């Protein structure tokens, strides 16, 4: 949400606000740096969506001198600048409040936090209009029904969604220009920050940061706001906190949990660490392109199997783009591991020839880590190919003339794949398609397409997303 006048003293989405230094903090104290390389009223660490709004409101509405530190070498923007760019439009505050209490079950989320979210969320369009964002208000998000669990008490009709044309990329360009107009400085290539804390009062008075290979000190006279995003690209944190592993992501590769480490160093406590707004997609298994890709099959000629080669789900109804990962948390004691993580998407030449399996540059849904609006230094790849062949050539999709050969190649990637089991699964699936009924998982008859047109293909499916 877009935080209003309280941004300099309270949390905004994806950020944490830390109190500034006291007036009697003398430079002679040992815990203070001998000198400051930069000084400001309000220090914002991270220039994604939360950092963008914190800096704008801090300077424009609160009248503070703001300095922003950004990890990326240029531009910044975070996930907010390469995703759909949607934001909530609250229609019924009391319904929304009831919904949040039902969804959180009043566990670990204080009512004051919910109330603050709603109070400021009611002003989203006000702030969007003030800063001249373009948007349309719709009753359904690109990702589907809103709110996510609208069947809960209070959920139905409590909110709409604002969709900006050009997605988050266009909104970022508008707001970044507003930031420049306000004279807010952003320092790029900033990393490895450590907060500077008064050991007696516990106040945060600034930070140290590496800019390139040089350590710099930054003094914050009024406060520090951490807007450093999540830990999508920190394997240790994902393994430690998330509810299954491996978990793979596309999106902003600089999200490595830096702010979480900073807070822990000064005695901060963590909460909600096992939560993720994510679905599932294809992991490339490519060290040079180490990210997830959202697959949008142009045809329904495919199935999902678990790691052992067994089909486990109605592939058309795994979950929404924000909760689809839940289906991958199944633990199998027979292998002492998560048997849906990874899963495999198995298909044949019919799907391969049906069209591109993901988004290309120039498509209507061109957003993510390949968009042409990203500078070369930040763009991870050039988007999906027109005919799917480049992804086979790179090894992202494996190919074989027979199911047995395909299963053998899959087993080279995951030892738990069983050749005989996968062959039996495909045979059973083809019989299901011939019968026109899926008695085990009840997939829609209109989508029951056999896998009998060689060659055959497969790719790994992991929980995760943007």
Language-model region placement:
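An anion/pyrophosphate-binding glycine-rich loop and adjacent beta-alpha core
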Residues: 260, 269-412
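Glycine-rich FAD pyrophosphate-binding loop
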Residues: 61-80
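Beta1/beta-strand and adjacent pyrophosphate-binding region of the FAD-binding site
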Residues: 36-48
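Core beta-strand elements of the Rossmann-like FAD/NAD(P) dinucleotide-binding domain
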Residues: 38-40, 214-223
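Glycine-rich active-site loop/strand segments that organize a redox cofactor
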Residues: 87-117
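Glycine-rich loop(s) and the adjacent beta-strand/alpha-helix scaffold that form part
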Residues: 219-286
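N-terminal export signals
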Residues: 1-21
């Amino acid at each position: 949400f877009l935080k209003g006048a309280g941004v300099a003293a309270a949390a905004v989405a994806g950020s944490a606000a830390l109190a500034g230094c006291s007036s009697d903090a003398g430079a002679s104290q040992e815990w203070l740096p001998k000198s400051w390389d930069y000084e400001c009223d309000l220090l914002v660490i991270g220039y994604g969506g939360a950092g963008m709004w914190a800096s704008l409101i801090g300077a424009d509405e609160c009248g503070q001198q703001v300095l922003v530190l950004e990890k990326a070498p240029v531009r910044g923007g975070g996930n907010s600048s390469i995703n759909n760019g949607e934001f909530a439009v609250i229609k019924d505050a009391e319904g929304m409040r009831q919904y949040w209490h039902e969804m959180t079950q009043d566990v670990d989320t204080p009512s004051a936090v919910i109330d603050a979210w709603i109070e400021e969320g009611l002003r989203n369009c006000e702030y969007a209009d003030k800063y001249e964002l373009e948007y349309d208000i719709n009753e359904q998000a690109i990702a589907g029904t809103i709110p996510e669990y609208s069947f809960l008490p209070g959920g139905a009709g409590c909110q709409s969604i604002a969709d900006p044309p050009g997605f988050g990329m266009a909104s970022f360009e508008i707001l970044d220009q507003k930031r420049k107009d306000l004279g807010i400085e952003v320092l790029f290539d900033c990393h490895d920050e450590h907060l500077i804390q008064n050991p007696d009062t516990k106040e945060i008075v600034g930070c140290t940061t590496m800019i390139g290979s040089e350590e710099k000190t930054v003094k914050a006279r009024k406060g520090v706001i951490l807007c450093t995003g999540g830990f999508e690209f920190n394997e240790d944190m994902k393994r430690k906190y998330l509810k299954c592993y491996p978990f793979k992501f596309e999106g902003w590769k600089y999200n490595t949990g830096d702010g979480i480490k900073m807070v822990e160093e000064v005695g901060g406590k963590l909460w909600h660490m096992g939560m993720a707004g994510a679905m599932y997609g294809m992991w490339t298994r490519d060290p040079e392109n180490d990210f997830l890709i959202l697959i949008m099959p142009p045809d329904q000629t495919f199935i999902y199997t678990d790691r052992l080669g067994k089909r486990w789900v109605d592939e058309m109804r795994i979950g929404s783009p924000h909760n689809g990962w839940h289906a991958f948390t199944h633990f199998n004691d027979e292998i002492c591991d998560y048997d849906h993580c990874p899963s495999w998407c198995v298909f044949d030449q019919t799907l391969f020839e049906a069209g591109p399996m993901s988004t290309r540059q120039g498509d209507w849904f061109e957003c993510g880590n390949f968009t042409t609006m990203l500078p070369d230094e930040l763009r991870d790849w050039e988007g999906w190919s027109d005919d799917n062949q480049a992804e086979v050539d790179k090894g992202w999709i494996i190919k074989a003339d027979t199911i047995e050969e395909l299963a053998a190649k899959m087993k080279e990637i995951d030892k738990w794949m069983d050749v005989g089991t996968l062959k039996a699964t495909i045979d059973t699936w083809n019989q299901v398609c011939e019968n026109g009924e899926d008695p085990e998982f009840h997939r829609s008859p209109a989508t029951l397409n056999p896998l009998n047109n060689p060659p055959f293909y497969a790719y790994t499916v992991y929980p995760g997303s943007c």
